[in-house]
Amino acid sequence: MHFDLTDDQEALRDGIRAVCQGRFPSERVREGFDRGTFDALGETGVFSLIADGFSWADATIAFEELGRAVVPGPLVWGVLAHGLVAGVPTGLDRPAPGAPAMVEHLAAADAVLVLDADAVRVVPTDAIVGTALDWPLDPLTPVARVADLPTGEVLAGADVTRWRRAGAVLTAAFQVGMAHACVEQATAYALDRRQFDRPVGSFQAIKHLLADALVRAEVARTAVHAAAVTLDDPEVGDVDRAVHGAKLLAGEAALKNAKTATQVHGGMGFTWEVDVHLALKRAWLLNTVFGSPDSHADALAS
């Protein structure tokens, strides 16, 4: 496969990156998700990429940039549901109904999309009774516990298998963006922080940490692009295998790189003021979305 970006893809990447830098600096990201966030991204065309004729490979490029900025919100659901559900959608993957559900961004959404075993169902949020968690894992992702999630109605035009695959790939692209951002943040700090009258980045132990982190991010990026290409053209390869591999590698890269960035920052890495903790908490959370690392590893092994 040939993964060099075309001129159009580079323009897409640069455009989304400029939007993220302009509209979603760290201070804005820390405020969390609101309707304005969704509207701002909608204006850029992020959610309508597939509907507008772009490929899944193009969409992963956009989501990598969103991940680099750790933009909050039910972004993947915005792409999957575009043109099918009005307002702000959120969702969850629940192949075995009946158990209590954890729903992200319930208060800000208009509808919850539920991926059941054989269909996508839509449930209006005004029909849902949920209890917001006081201390969610990711402070930028509010979560509500729903004891009895209504069945909802089947969403016409939604292929549940394709949604699961696409959702996993877009989430993996977001994770790759976070993995690269962690490398960049840790490298910048290692070049700036001095000990023994020299940058700490000059020490071999730090160099090895950062080199390993970069390798993880690049390997994951390649896997994600390969999975996106198979979504666009299933004849290229085994779609399920590519998706499982991409989500597994991207999740590992995001989590391990966030931990590495925390370590390189030393004591500062554990403070609220340093942005690294935002990536670490989001990385933990995203490893529970569209399949856990264990579920993807088991699928690959089988």
Give the role of each language-model region:
Residues 70-184, 188:
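FAD-binding core of flavoproteins
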